Each structure stands twice: as C-alpha cells, then as structure tokens.
From Swiss-Prot:
Known catalytic reactions: di-trans,octa-cis-undecaprenyl diphospho-N-acetyl-alpha-D-muramoyl-L-alanyl-D-glutamyl-meso-2,6-diaminopimeloyl-D-alanyl-D-alanine + UDP-N-acetyl-alpha-D-glucosamine = di-trans,octa-cis-undecaprenyl diphospho-[N-acetyl-alpha-D-glucosaminyl-(1->4)]-N-acetyl-alpha-D-muramoyl-L-alanyl-D-glutamyl-meso-2,6-diaminopimeloyl-D-alanyl-D-alanine + UDP + H(+)
Protein residues bound to UDP-N-acetyl-alpha-D-glucosamine: 12-14, 124, 162, 185, 242, 261-266, 287
Keyword field contains Glycosyltransferase: yes
Species, as recorded: Pseudoalteromonas translucida (strain TAC 125)
GO molecular function: UDP-N-acetyl-D-glucosamine:N-acetylmuramoyl-L-alanyl-D-glutamyl-meso-2,6-diaminopimelyl-D-alanyl-D-alanine-diphosphoundecaprenol 4-beta-N-acetylglucosaminlytransferase activity; undecaprenyldiphospho-muramoylpentapeptide beta-N-acetylglucosaminyltransferase activity
Function: Cell wall formation. Catalyzes the transfer of a GlcNAc subunit on undecaprenyl-pyrophosphoryl-MurNAc-pentapeptide (lipid intermediate I) to form undecaprenyl-pyrophosphoryl-MurNAc-(pentapeptide)GlcNAc (lipid intermediate II).
Name assigned to this protein: UDP-N-acetylglucosamine--N-acetylmuramyl-(pentapeptide) pyrophosphoryl-undecaprenol N-acetylglucosamine transferase
Record-linked InterPro entries: GlcNAc_MurG (IPR006009), Glyco_trans_28_C (IPR007235), GlycoTrans_28_N (IPR004276)
C-alpha cells in the first residue's frame, strides 16, 4: 500500500511552488499526495492545475492586520484547527509536510494532536511566525538557508526548485552583456522607473542588451522609457510577464531582481550574477537576509531600494561591464552556493519520519 503525504502551503508562490516540486517528486516515487490550503489565495487555482487534490480551511494572517483581527484571532485559529483535524482524519496521511503560509500553523497543530508526523520546511533566511512555533514540536525541521533557525535546530536542505533550472547551460559572457530585469509577477516600480535611464548611461560605454519584465499594467510606460533613451528593438525586449523564465535565465549574464527565497535559490542554481533589490516591506526584512546568503559568498550584489537610483546602479555595474570576467567569477560563486538536491532531500525526510512511525 502506497504512503500518503498531505502538503500544506499557501499564500504566495514562494511557499506553493516548492511544495508542488516535492509533491510531484513524491508522486513519481509512488506516493499519494493531497493538499491543504485556503480558498481565497493562489493555491486554490495553482495546485489543481498540477493534478493535486486540494482541501480548504479558513484562516487569515494576524500580524499587521489591525486590532479587530487580533481580537478574533484565537477563535479563527481554533476553528481552523478543527477544520484541519477533520480533513486529516478523512485523508489519513502518513506525514504532513508544511511549506509555509498562514495555513500551516493550524494544520501543523492538528497533525500533532492526531499523532501524524510533521515535517516543516522554511524557504526564507528568517523563519516565519508559523514555522517558529511549529519547529518546537515538529518531527523534522528543514531549512533552505543556514540562518533560518538556531544552530542545530534544522537540517539544511535548500529550496526545491524546478529541475529545468539546474539544467540551464553555462553561458560564455560576451558582448553585448545581457541584463535580465525581473520584478516579480506584479513588477517592481523602482526597477521600471530607474533602469531605462541607467542602462542608457551604461550603454554609452558598454554594449548591453536588456530583457525587462515590467509586471501587469506597466508595459507601455516602460517601453516608452526605453524608446526615449534611444534603445532599439534589437537590443531591448520588454514584456509584462516572461512565461519561460528558464530561457530568460539562460540568456542572461546579469539578473536584477527582488530577493524572494525562491528567486535567490533559482539564481544560485542557474549560476547567474545577480543584483538583488530587496522588497523593503517584507516581514522581518527577510528578503535582505535571503540576498545576504549569496552576497557574503561574493555570489551577488545587494542594492537597498532606498539607495537605488540611476547614479548608484551605474556606479555598481560599470566595473563588471568593463571587465566581464568579473561577471563570470560572481556567477560561478553563486553556483557553488546552490543546493541541487533539495527536492529529493525534503522527500527523503518525509520518508524517514514515516519509517520511524511504522
């Protein structure tokens, strides 16, 4: 009889897509897999597209959402725990794998109360509130970055990323230098408004090509900015969203982007030089901590959003464009920090805790 895993993750792609990667891997190994999420967030539409059955519980974030929700929080969480217990009693999993998001707290508690082994995985360099609590009683605590938990509390396994990212061929840096700009699916206005002028100044003394993801609703203004700075369509590609990010990574010599956990792990896995511009309003400033994992290894550059302007980006990139071997060196350093077997490692830990239960 095959084993069964319930994956718990929700809210953002940074939690959901690593969970899907592990779910797909477990299914290939003969496991049955289902999911617990919330009905009003990304997982509700994304998970079913991957042929994974999903059950829903009702829970919302408490932190930073006002006094009314804080007062109601104990009742909401208790109700969510009861809903999760009902789902788990029906699903009868051998293990629960919690990958982050508000949904993991109540479901992790429900798993513990039912004696179901619990494995948690933290994608960010600073653990979220739910995982900090669940780590106190989880059967196995896994982390993508060494700084997420206290020394000795977690197993370092990396972030599960798509296998296709690891297969991206090493590009020989040559003229023109290819610069990829990715601000997330919604874009990042600081990148959209600053970089066309900065690239124009850099392009006066260096041959560069640009592929810029603007995010929804910003295509026209960014295209106009590049045209105003005399960029031709031959060396500039602007899109609201890049569907094939693997091709974009393969094309790029330098990536300018936010530093969400999955992005940092993908950059390392692809072996690319990055300039990280952390989202300044991330909880606990975890995007800066994520970026530091590569920065301290001389595998990436960091530019705080408050310092991000035309002059600073020109000063930052000019030495690398003038000496492309520095780009190659930084990309190689990033690749050395990648943990390439993260998906298999997470699956292995799920297997191990179920074996101990048998």
């Amino acid at each position: 009889m095959s084993k069964k895993c319930v994956v718990v993750a929700g809210g953002t792609g940074g939690h959901i897509f690593p969970g899907i990667a592990v779910a797909d891997y477990l299914k290939q190994q003969g496991w049955q897999v289902s999911w617990i999420g919330t009905p009003d967030r990304m997982e509700a539409t994304v998970v079913p597209k991957h042929n994974i059955d999903i059950n829903f519980i009702n829970v919302k974030g408490v932190r930073g959402n006002g006094i009314k929700r804080l007062i109601k929080a104990p009742f909401m969480v208790l109700n969510a725990i009861l809903q999760a217990r009902k789902v788990l009693k029906s699903e009868k999993p051998d293990v629960v794998l919690a990958m982050g998001g508000y949904v993991t707290g109540p479901t992790g508690i429900a798993a513990k109360s039912l004696g179901i082994p619990l494995v948690i995985h933290e994608q960010n360099a600073i653990a979220g509130m739910s995982n900090k609590w669940l780590a106190k009683f989880a059967n196995r605590v896994l982390a993508a970055f060494p700084s997420a938990f206290a020394t000795g509390q977690a197993e370092l396994v990396g972030n599960p990323v798509r296998e296709s990212v690891a297969n991206i061929a090493v590009r020989e840096v040559s003229s023109p230098i290819n610069i990829l700009v990715v601000g997330g699916s919604l874009g990042a206005q600081v990148l959209n408004t600053t970089l066309p002028a900065a690239f124009a100044e850099l392009g006066n003394t260096n041959a560069i090509s640009v592929w810029h993801q603007t995010g929804k609703g910003h295509l026209g203004s960014v295209e106009a900015a590049y045209k105003s700075h005399k960029f031709s369509t031959e060396n500039t590609k602007v899109a609201e969203f890049i569907d094939d990010i693997d091709t974009a990574y393969g094309w790029a010599d330098i990536v300018i982007c936010r530093s969400g956990a999955l992005t940092v792990s993908e950059i390392a896995t692809a072996g690319k030089m990055a300039v990280f511009v952390p989202f300044p309003h991330a909880v606990d400033d975890h995007q800066t901590a994520n970026a530091q994992y590569l920065v301290v290894a001389n595998g990436a550059l960091l530019m705080p959003q408050g310092q991000f302007n035309q002059q600073s980006i020109v000063a930052l990139l000019s030495p690398y464009l003038a000496k492309p071997s520095l780009i190659k060196e930084m990309a190689a350093n990033a690749k050395q920090q990648a943990i390439l077997d993260a998906t298999a490692s997470v699956a292995m830990h799920c297997e191990q805790v179920t074996n101990k239960r048998a």
